[in-house]
């Protein structure tokens, strides 16, 4: 039985770090790693949307992950997003992530074309096979990927024992409940994790069953999300809602720009 408690909590999406010339800043990545560890984050999600994964060369993604791991290994949970717009690069990044010692790899589905479910499953399973000793997280973000995680596809992926979680960034919190129920049905209580993705609904996702959150603004205001998580764990829902409301107003202002 896997111990998945290392994934339960507040996991900031790690930001892309560049120097003044637009190159990957390893020193910036190391500094951000140390900062977020000091703040009390449960882990990091490296190379995802906030890490500008789709815009980076695989070598840049490797370089940033190596910088993070040089500071984080053995101290904090690290999930590396390895999805690319082709299987070969995705597989290469998966193998690299395992070689540097991440806790899990993750991936969005193939983007642009709406591929059949068997093709999406093969894409994910090929990555997982390239990192056979590393756990796998499905990243569901249909509004950007163009393809959503269906229950039939999730059930197919649950045949892979390394698939231990879904990061759910769709807006309906009902999806969290459905994915969680499917995971429990297949694996048993405590053996499947669902992350809340949308920052503006952290509390609502946790209340309906998410084990933690994985979001893009956690790294700039971690204290609020850590407080919300603590409130939710103690069923202090009024306090949690108050912080959530404040954070949501900040997000709405950011989105107005």
Describe the role of every protein-language-model region.
Residues 2-148:
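Active-site beta->alpha loop and helix N-cap motifs at the rims of alpha/beta catalytic domains
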Residues 1, 13, 99, 233-242:
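Polar low-complexity intrinsically disordered regions
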Residues 129-130, 142-256:
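Catalytic alpha/beta core domains of metabolic enzymes, predominantly
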Residues 43, 256-257:
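Short amphipathic alpha-helical segments at helix boundaries and their inter-helical linkers
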Residues 1, 35, 96-97, 157, ...:
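A general structural signal for stabilizing positions within well-ordered secondary structure
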């Amino acid at each position: 039985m896997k111990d998945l408690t290392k994934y339960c909590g507040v996991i900031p999406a790690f930001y892309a770090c560049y120097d003044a010339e637009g190159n990957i800043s390893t020193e910036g990545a190391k500094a951000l790693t140390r900062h977020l560890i000091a703040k009390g984050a449960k882990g990091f999600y490296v190379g995802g949307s906030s890490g500008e994964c789709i815009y980076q060369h695989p070598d840049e993604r490797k370089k940033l992950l190596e910088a993070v791991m040089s500071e984080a290994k053995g101290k904090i949970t690290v999930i590396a997003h390895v999805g690319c717009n082709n299987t070969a690069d995705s597989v290469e990044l998966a193998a690299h992530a395992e070689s540097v010692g991440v806790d899990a790899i993750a991936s969005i589905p193939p983007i642009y074309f709406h591929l059949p479910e068997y093709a999406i499953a093969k894409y994910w399973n090929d990555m997982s096979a390239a990192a056979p000793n590393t756990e796998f997280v499905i990243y569901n973000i249909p509004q950007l990927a163009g393809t959503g995680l269906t229950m039939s596809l999730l059930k197919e992926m649950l045949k892979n024992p390394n698939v231990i979680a879904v990061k759910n960034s769709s807006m309906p919190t009902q999806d969290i409940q459905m994915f969680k129920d499917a995971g429990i049905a297949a694996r048993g209580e405590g053996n499947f994790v669902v992350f809340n993705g949308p920052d503006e609904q952290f509390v609502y996702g946790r209340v309906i069953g998410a084990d933690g959150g994985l979001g893009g603004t956690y790294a700039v205001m971690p204290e609020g999300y850590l407080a919300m998580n603590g409130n939710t764990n103690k069923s202090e829902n009024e306090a949690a809602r108050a912080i959530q409301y404040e954070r949501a107003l900040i997000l709405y202002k950011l989105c107005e720009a």
